[in-house]
Amino acid sequence: AGYDWPSLVKKDGDELFDHYRHTLEELGRQKGLLGLIFNKSQNKFQDPAKLRRLIVDLIDKETWVSMSADVKGDAYEGLLEKNAQDTKSGAGQYFTPRPLIQAIVDAMAPTPGETISDPACGTGGFLLAAHDYVVKHYPNMTSAEKKKLRGESFKGWELVQATARLCAMNMLLHGIGSQEFEPIAVGDSLAADPGERFDVVLTNPPFGKKSSTTI
């Protein structure tokens, strides 16, 4: 208990440092997307004063809860795209250009009730575009259909832990997934039959990561 944002804002100095570290550890033990996002996360700050400035002076001054998922999600997508364009980071191999994704999703035209998978999901672009397509083209979905769309319709696999973490955050900010359903799995989707079947498969096969699996 007590590992939340208000508790961080109240702390300062070494006490803040310790509480921040314990908060990261606790979040990493959670189920669902939160656990994946914060799994093995570490405090990279060396100076407690800088951490406090980030928490109190920058982040806490914004009213994040009043922002829609579209605003927060689009901002995060923009950061992912900017990072992918940095050739030194090597992140481009996990980020498919959004216009290409949109063209493929438009061609597949997913519908409410269908299950959609990306066996090499990277930062989650195909899954998010498929979600947006269904929402846009089927505005009269029932509450049950909307709940199923957000909570049960998407599943992605990502081999690289750090990239899976980026994808999980992307999904969370867009309101997809839940504590009961984890839409992102860390692992090689070709290593074994996952035992699941899907109506639609959208993917851009990875070319930047070697695997022991041969096809």
Where in the sequence are the language-model features?
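Non-catalytic, mostly N-terminal accessory regions of nucleic-acid modification and defense proteins
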Residues: 1-112, 175, 179, 183-189
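Conserved S-adenosyl-L-methionine
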Residues: 90-203, 208-210
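A mobile, often basic/glycine-rich helix-loop segment
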Residues: 213-215
